[in-house]
Amino acid sequence: MATASDSKYKRTNTNGMQHQPLDVAIVGGGLVGSLLALHLGKKGHEVNLYEYREDIRTAELVIGRSINLALSARGRRALAEVGLEDALLNHGIPMSGRMLHDVNGKCKIVPYDANTNQCIYSVGRKHLNEVLLNAAEKYPNIHLHFNHKLVSANLDEGNLSMVDPVTKDVKSARADLIVGCDGAYSAVRKEIVKRPRYDFSQTYIEHGYLELCIPPTAGGEFAMPHNYLHIWPRGQFMMIALPNQDRTWTVTLFMPFTQFHSITDQGLLLDFFRQHFPDAIELIGRERLVKDFFKTKAQPLVMIKCRPYHIGAKALIIGDAAHAMVPFYGQGMNAGFEDCSVLTELFNQYGTDLARILPEFSEKRWEDAHAICDLAMYNYIEMRDLVTKRSYLLRKKLDELLFWMMPNTWVPLYNSVSFSHMRYSKCIANRAWQDKILTRVLYGASIASVAAIGGLCYRHVTMGHLERLSTRILSTFQLLKPKASV
């Protein structure tokens, strides 16, 4: 891990310019805030991290808050930049694909990457936050302040006013830079949206989520194959399960609030599960299912879009404070961590010139952030419904085939989002031209149509790729036939 450094010395950026360390106030000590503290602390800046809750390292887990996260390439890079990637991967559980459960209990495996076998990692939220805070605490120039709730701010002057939720003591602070990492209901963003002509939208979906748990088997093992994200897609609703280090599974039920509200007693709950998730009753356990379902209420899901992310040369929002998204692409944390990487790159480029760093961050990130917010919303439709349709499975086979033949040119959407650092907006642009090609092929439904892909791809591939395409396409056509469920 990177070692702590003395913030009293001048720092040098990648352009060779020396600069005095900044006083930075980070509001929000969750995942993104604590990682940003490490990024800026490593560069020698004086960082004060303010969190309204008590220290998560000594607090009990909050009911209703997901303890699972899917770590992929963008998040891994941001962790690697502060020397923590290996520690988190060693603790995480690799998931190589989705395992789909039908209503009869039969399962089908859909790999994330059938060609190169890349995977995402299930990591515990609390563990990850603890690792980040422990690492931050080792820097003498990073200072952690818990039970500090922001109540007002003068973002033009860099002044903050906070209150201790327990003692009600009022505290103030001043900083050269204020960064809001305080989540979807950001107090820093509330100050920013007061500005005239500020773009802001907030969208709640009609679905909520409620968490359940699958315990280990009597022998202390996982109750299901643990290297997969398990999904029970049911059209208008779905259930997913991610593995934990203690051999339990965090199960999340997503469905319309009207449906949650219609399940008012034990009998209705068990009837609902017998009809839609019969195999899950045995996995969860009847008594545990009833207890966990009724002990808490379904939680809302919100998408936030706004721009710009900065105010002058004094304030910035990142992570969920800037672009909260529904959790169906597993990119919320990864996008927030990527914010840290992008911001650090700008510090490397411009030193401490916040008048250049902050506007450029806003300009670089807003389009990509809006793109992944929209993509996450669409992916809910895919996960709960489309994954069971033959047209979707055929499309995925075509994606895999072309990715195998042209790995540097044809990259499936999921791969570009989860396993690369391509801009989110570019990922969607690539998908658009791929869709045009595949639509022609799917409507053609013949070997000749598949062979025609070579011509349609001409503008996107080199002659070497075309040569491989023409020699392999006929021999691999059998891959396009949909397979029966296992």
From Swiss-Prot:
Pathway: Cofactor biosynthesis; NAD(+) biosynthesis; quinolinate from L-kynurenine: step 1/3. GO terms for biological process: 'de novo' NAD biosynthetic process from L-tryptophan; anthranilate metabolic process; kynurenine metabolic process; L-tryptophan catabolic process; NAD metabolic process; quinolinate biosynthetic process. It catalyses: L-kynurenine + NADPH + O2 + H(+) = 3-hydroxy-L-kynurenine + NADP(+) + H2O. GO terms for cellular component: mitochondrial outer membrane. It is found in: Mitochondrion; Membrane. Its cofactor is FAD. It holds the Pfam family FAD_binding_3. It is a multi-pass membrane protein. One of its GO terms (molecular function) is kynurenine 3-monooxygenase activity. The chain crosses the membrane at residues 401-424, 437-459. Keywords: FAD, Flavoprotein, Membrane, Mitochondrion, Monooxygenase, NADP, Oxidoreductase, Pyridine nucleotide biosynthesis, Transmembrane, Transmembrane helix. InterPro entries: FAD-bd, FAD/NAD-bd_sf, Kynurenine_monooxygenase. Its EC number is 1.14.13.9. Belongs to the aromatic-ring hydroxylase family. KMO subfamily. Catalyzes the hydroxylation of L-kynurenine (L-Kyn) to form 3-hydroxy-L-kynurenine (L-3OHKyn). Required for synthesis of quinolinic acid. This is Kynurenine 3-monooxygenase. It comes from Anopheles gambiae (African malaria mosquito).
